[in-house]
Amino acid sequence: MQRAREAEMMKSQVLFPFLLSLFCGAISQQIRYTIPEELANGSRVGKLAKDLGLSVRELPTRKLRVSAEDYFNVSLESGDLLVNGRIDREKICGRKLECALEFETVAENPMNVFHVVVVIQDINDNAPRFVAKGIDLEICESALPGVKFSLDSAQDADVEGNSLKLYTINPNQYFSLSTKESPDGSKYPVLLLEKPLDREHQSSHRLILTAMDGGDPPLSGTTHIWIRVTDANDNAPVFSQEVYRVSLQENVPWGTSVLRVMATDQDEGINAEITYAFLNSPISTSLFNLNPNTGDITTNGTLDFEETSRYVLSVEAKDGGVHTAHCNVQIEIVDENDNAPEVTFMSFSNQIPEDSDLGTVIALIKVRDKDSGQNGMVTCYTQEEVPFKLESTSKNYYKLVIAGALNREQTADYNVTIIATDKGKPALSSRTSITLHISDINDNAPVFHQASYVVHVSENNPPGASIAQVSASDPDLGPNGRVSYSILASDLEPRELLSYVSVSPQSGVVFAQRAFDHEQLRAFELTLQARDQGSPALSANVSLRVLVGDLNDNAPRVLYPALGPDGSALFDMVPRAAEPGYLVTKVVAVDADSGHNAWLSYHVLQASEPGLFSLGLRTGEVRTARALGDRDAARQRLLVAVRDGGQPPLSATATLHLIFADSLQEVLPDLSDRPEPSDPQTELQFYLVVALALISVLFLLAVILAIALRLRRSSSLDTEGCFQTGLCSKSGPGVPPNHSEGTLPYSYNLCIASHSAKTEFNSLNLTPEMAPPQDLLCDDPSMVVCASNEDHKIAYDPSLSSHQAPPNTDWRFSQAQRPGTSGSQNGDDTGTWPNNQFDTEMLQAMILASASEAADGSSTLGGGAGTMGLSARYGPQFTLQHVPDYRQNVYIPGSNATLTNAAGKRDGKAPAGGNGNKKKSGKKEKK
C-alpha cells in the first residue's frame, strides 16, 4: 500500500511539472499556510477557495484539486483546504529547522494553477528515547573522585525548543551527572564519580538515567545504568628518599615551592596512579600545601622563626588500591626581622555609662614585639577622633581613658583603632580595633510627634473602633525608651471618661468605647501622657481634641401644629373673606442635627383643594393663594412634609385641618362631626373608671337593699312619710308624682382654638338665681335614690328609672386634660374639688356629657332662663374654676338615674349619649 502511494506521488510529481510547462501562463501567486503537525483528519488548514478568489458555487465546475492528496484535499462544499492524512513533521522533514509542504492547486474551466505552501510547525510529540535498553560500566574501586564517564545519548525527533535539553540521574552519594554538548549541537550525559568506591562494601550500583526535552509540558525517557566495581592492585608505592631536608627563609610568600617528594608503583593503569597527602599533621596542613598528584610542597601560611624554627612533615603516598608508603620532610626556617608589635588587652570594660566622668579608665593595654633592639621598641596611639585617649603607665603598658563627654543618643558605639608601631627599618606596625558600647541612662523624656492632635469622628461610630493614634518617641534605650500611653485628664466627667474612650498603653491608639452622639457631645478634649519605664520615669503630655461630626440621624420634629393621638394636626379657622396672602398658620419644626442636616424645607404632599393655599419653602408659613370660591369646601386638609438637608434626607409630616368660617358657631358643627382619634391610654382609663363605677354601684345597691330590709321590719315608721332627707318609700300602688319642676339657670361660653379638636369645659359656675325645689317624692317600687345637699336638690323622673341613658363618649379624658389640683385654680373658688380619683372622674363624666349636649344644640340644659348653663373651652389644658361640691347631686354612671330636666323629658328629647348621633345646629341645617 505504501509503495502504491509513493508511486502515485511520483506520477504526480512527473505530471504536474508537465502541466506547469503547458499552463505556465496561468500560474498565480503563492498561497502560504501554517499549521501544527499531527492535525486530525478533516481539520481545516485554510479557506483555499476564498484565498484563490473562487466562489463556493463554482467549485464543482472548476474541479478544484491539489497535488498533495496524501496530506490534503479540498472540500467542494466549503472550499476549505482540509487535512487528509497524518502530517508527521519528523517523518516529512526530519530534523530540519524549517519544514514546509509545497504543492500545486489546479482549477479547470478555465485552467489555473496555484502554488500552495503549508508550513508545518513542530509540536512536542516525541519523547527522548535511548537506543539501548541499558548501559553497562565497570569502575575500579580505586578510582578517584572526579573521574568522568561519557554515556550514550538519547534521541529526540523534535527540534528546537522541543528537542533534548538535559539528563538527570536518581540521587546517590557516589555519582553525579552533567550534560555536555557536542560540536554538532547534540547533548550527551557525563557521569562523574563524587566519592571513592568500596567494592568490599558495595560491588555494584544501579542508576536510572533520565533524558528530558524542553517542551511544555516536557517529555522524558529513561534507561538503566549498571555499574560493576572491580578490584586489582598488588604493588605498594616506594619513595625515592626516606628523609627529605630543606632550608627556607621565614616570611616567604604564600605558594613558595619548598620541594617535591616522589614515589613510584610498578603496577599499571589505575593501580599505578599515586596520590600524596600529609599524615596526621595539623600544623603541616595549616602552613604547607601538598599537591596530591605531583607531590609538590608549597607554603600555605606565614613562617615565623620566633615561633617555630624547624618543621617536620610526614608524607604518605597511596596507589589506586590500598597500598601506601611514608617519608619525612625536615624544613629549617632561617630567621629575619619580621615581627610586628602585638597589642593585648589586660582588662576591658565593654559597656560604658553615658554619664561617666572624664578620666575614667576604660581598658588596660599591653604591647609586645618579639624582635629585639630598636625593632622591639613600640609606641601606641589611636587613629580616629574619638572621646578617648591612650596614656602610658609603664614600659609596654597603656591605659585607655575617657577624654570627652559621652551621649548615647548621638553616638551609641565607638570603634577605637589602636595602632602599635616599632622603630625598625622599615617600621612594622599592627592595628587593633575595639568596639565600645555606650550604655543608656534615662536622661530623655518622651517627645510627641505633634504638639497637639485634632481628630474628626463621625457620630454613631461603632464601639471599639479606633479614632486616633498618638505617637511619642524616646531616644533612650530599653526600658528607658519604652513608652506607655495613658489618659491623664479630660474635660469629660471622670465617671463618664472610661465609658467614652480608652487608649492602648502600647500603641497609643485611642478607641471609642461607645457610639458618639453629635447632639449630646460635639467635642471633647483629652490630655494624654507618654511615660517611659526608666527609674525615675520621665513623661510628656499632649492634648487630643476629638470633634464629633454630625450625621443626619435625626428626623425633623414638628412642634406646631401639635399632633393628636392619631398623628394628625388640629383645626385652624380661616375667615371666609381672607384675601390671597392671608397668613393662616405656620408649621414650626426643629431638627436636632446641625448644619445642612438641620436645614429644613416645607413641602405640600397632599391638599384637598390644590392651589388654594401656599406654603413657604423655608418659613413653613401657610397662606391663602387665592380667595375662597363658592365651590370650595369649607373644610380643607393639607398634608405637609418637613425635610432636612441631609443625605439621605429625613422627613416628618404634619396634617393641617383648616375650616373657613366667619364665626365660632359655624365651626362647632364641623368639630362635632369630626371623629375623635382612639387613644389607647384613654381607653384604658375609661375601662378602669367603668370598672370602679360598677363596683361602687353594686356596693351602693347592697347598702340600699340592706337599709330597705331594715325599714320593712320596722313597724314604727309611717308608710307615707319620708324617713330621710333624700330617700322615700311607698308601699301602696303607684301614684303620679306630685312634685315641682324647675330649671337651674346657667350660662355657657364656647371658645375654639386652632390646635384643639375637643370641646373642653373651662368652668362650671352656679348662678345665684337657682330656685330650690319645692318637694320631692320617691316611688317605692323603683327604689329611686334621691341625692341632695343642704341647699339644692335635683329632681329625677321616676318613669325613666328603668331606661338608663348611656354616657357621652366625650366623658373620658386624656392624661394632658386631667383636671388639675387646687394649685392650678384661683384661690377664691367657692367650690371644693372632689378629694378622690373616683369622684373626680365621675364629675368629669357629668361635665363632658353636658358639654356635648350644649355643643350640638340638643341639650336639655339650655342656656335660657331657669336652665343650667356650662362654659366650655377648646384648648390643650383643661381647668375647672368655681366648681361647688356637686358630689351629692351628680348622676353616677351605672345607676338607674339620668341627669336631665323636666322640660327635656316632656319634649321627648333623649339626652346626648355616647353613640355620637348628634343633631346639627340650626345654621348647619340651613346650609
UniProtKB/Swiss-Prot annotation:
A Pfam family assignment: Cadherin_tail
InterPro entries: Cadherin-like_dom (IPR002126), Cadherin-like_sf (IPR015919), Cadherin_C (IPR032455), Cadherin_CBD (IPR031904), Cadherin_CS (IPR020894), Cadherin_N (IPR013164), Protocadherin/Cadherin-CA (IPR050174)
Cellular component aspect of the GO annotation: growth cone; plasma membrane
Regions of compositional bias (Polar residues) in chain numbering: 799-836
Residues modified by glycosylation: N41, N73, N300, N415, N541
Keyword terms, alphabetized: Calcium, Cell adhesion, Cell membrane, Glycoprotein, Membrane, Repeat, Signal, Transmembrane, Transmembrane helix
Record GO terms (molecular function): calcium ion binding
Region ranges (Disordered): 797-836, 897-927
TM ranges: 688-708
PROSITE patterns in UniProt: CADHERIN_1, CADHERIN_2
Entry annotated with the keyword DNA-binding: no
Signal peptide residues on this chain, from the entry's feature table: 1-28
Topology feature Extracellular, residues: 29-687
Chief place where the protein resides: membrane
Example of a GO biological process term: nervous system development
Cytoplasmic topological domain: 709-927
Disulfide bonds: none
Location of this chain's protein in the cell: Cell membrane
Biased composition (Basic residues): 917-927
Gene3D superfamilies given in the database record: Cadherins
Domain spans labelled Cadherin: 29-130, 131-239, 240-343, 344-448, 449-558, 566-671
Membrane topology summary: Single-pass type I membrane protein
PANTHER family named among the record's database cross-references: CADHERIN-87A, PROTOCADHERIN GAMMA-B1
Summary of the function given for this chain in its UniProt record: Potential calcium-dependent cell-adhesion protein. May be involved in the establishment and maintenance of specific neuronal connections in the brain.
Name the UniProt record assigns to this protein: Protocadherin gamma-B1
Organism: Homo sapiens
Upper classification of the organism: Eukaryota, Metazoa, Chordata, Craniata, Vertebrata
Gene: PCDHGB1
